[in-house]
């Protein structure tokens, strides 16, 4: 994502040498090296190091009811400027002016500190890393999720978390900067029947074309609609890996793992709602290095997953900025037709990004007897990667209306390859049909859709 910002990135601090710092993150850099490069960029552009840390590795502010309004506005603004870095990480950094230590929002790495009576601050993964006499220690503790502790070496001050956040929140008029932010409820209502629905034989044919079976409906869709959570089985999963299966498999299945490849601690469902967010945004602010060079026409959504009515509302809200790309190709063609279709989709997206249709909507609704859908993961990834290489991605949004989406994994893969929003319209249509058949008891259709 840093590459998408580089096309608009400018600061008076760099003068005429701004192009010399690009790319900010070298190809092949490790996670640590990438974060180091991003922090150095922000610091050298004039931001204080605690501000850079708060911008890149923020605390979980969305679900913190006791947070001061000015601090919340600061984080809201920063979230609209910069994509957050997740961690897990215990950070220690200095630029000669500041010495800062802090944790990411999950705090899955320990960070303890000791302060002595002669002004020595020791911070590390555990107490006892540096031998200190107990009589010298005047304060000890550990940092919590998203917290910082820092020393202003120039002023000789030790600043704790609340002092730092309050100081950063006063660096710019953040509350006025976010005053113009909008939500989906602020958009105009769409025209009636703006989002077509599918039913009967047409729905059945579309479900078959998308590879969805009755078993999928019963085991996956119904569990999500009734309980608002993924289905859990107890008998294991012996389905062959997609890459060696002799059955047709969706592209998302090639990204599925049956084991925990990364050994970071898991996030339980209770902690997840406090430390994670699904918020997404439109109208990326223009320049990540300058607060006064921003666009206040920012739309923030609570989730990238849209219902069909929300999809229609989004299109109506964007008006003539909408560009629609058909992600289908002729049925019965040659294997090379898929590559040609993806090249066409990329070319159309580039033309829209360079023109006035910056809100790109990819859809496979034209699927039918003579048209088959391009795998939407390939289409979305191709558009995102192509626009990034052309320096156009930060000017656009990529909104996907896909028949392939049924489970959370497919939705997550689409967001992971670059989709701004996703509308699983066919799964929603199937849910409506099953509700009409009385399969969800007394539950309202609105509640079933919300659960899903």
Residue ranges and their predicted role:
Residues 1-20, 33, 62-90, 96-101, ...:
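Glycine-rich phosphate/ribose-binding loops and adjacent secondary-structure elements
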Residues 2-293, 307:
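Conserved short alpha-helical segments that host acidic/polar catalytic motifs at enzyme active sites
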Residues 227-231, 238-391:
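Non-catalytic terminal/interface segments that mediate subunit docking, oligomerization
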């Amino acid at each position: 994502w840093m590459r998408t910002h580089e096309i608009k990135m400018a600061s008076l601090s760099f003068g005429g040498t701004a192009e010399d710092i690009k790319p900010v993150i070298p190809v092949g850099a490790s996670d640590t090296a990438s974060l180091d490069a991003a922090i150095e960029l922000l610091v050298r552009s004039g931001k204080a190091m605690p501000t850079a840390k708060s911008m890149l590795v923020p605390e979980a502010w969305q679900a913190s009811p006791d947070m001061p309004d000015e601090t919340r506005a600061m984080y809201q603004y920063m979230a609209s400027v910069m994509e957050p870095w997740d961690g897990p990480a215990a950070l220690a950094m200095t630029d000669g002016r500041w010495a800062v230590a802090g944790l990411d929002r999950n705090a899955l790495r320990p960070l303890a500190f000791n302060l002595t009576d002669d002004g020595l601050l020791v911070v590390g993964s555990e107490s006892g890393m540096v031998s200190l006499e107990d009589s010298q220690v005047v304060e000890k503790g550990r940092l919590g999720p998203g917290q910082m502790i820092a020393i202003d070496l120039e002023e000789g001050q030790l600043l704790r978390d609340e002092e730092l956040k309050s100081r950063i929140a006063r660096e710019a008029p953040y509350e006025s900067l976010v005053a113009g932010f909008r939500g989906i409820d602020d958009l105009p209502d769409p025209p009636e029947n703006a989002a077509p629905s599918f039913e009967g034989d047409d729905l059945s044919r579309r479900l078959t074309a998308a590879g969805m079976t009755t078993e999928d409906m019963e085991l996956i869709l119904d569990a999500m609609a009734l309980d608002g959570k993924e289905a859990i089985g107890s008998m294991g999963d012996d389905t062959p890996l997609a890459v060696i299966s002799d059955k047709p498999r969706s592209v998302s299945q090639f990204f599925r793992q049956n084991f925990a490849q990364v050994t970071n601690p898991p996030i339980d469902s209770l902690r997840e709602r406090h430390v994670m967010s699904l918020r997404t945004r439109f109208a990326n602010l223009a320049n990540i290095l300058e607060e006064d060079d921003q666009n206040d026409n920012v739309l923030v959504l609570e989730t990238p997953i849209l219902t069909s009515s929300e999809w229609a509302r989004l299109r109506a809200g964007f008006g003539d900025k909408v560009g629609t790309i058909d992600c289908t190709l002729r049925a019965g063609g040659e294997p090379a037709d898929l590559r040609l279709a993806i090249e066409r989709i990329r070319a159309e997206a580039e033309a829209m990004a360079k023109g006035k249709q910056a809100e790109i909507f990819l859809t496979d609704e034209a699927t039918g007897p003579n048209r088959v859908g391009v795998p939407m993961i390939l289409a979305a990834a191709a558009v995102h990667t192509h626009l990034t290489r052309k320096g156009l991605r930060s000017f656009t949004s990529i909104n996907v209306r896909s028949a392939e989406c049924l489970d959370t994994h497919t939705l997550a893969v689409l967001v992971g390859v670059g989709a701004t929003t996703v509308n699983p319209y066919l799964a929603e249509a199937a849910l409506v049909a099953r509700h009409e058949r009385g399969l969800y008891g007394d539950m309202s259709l609105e509640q079933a859709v919300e659960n899903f």
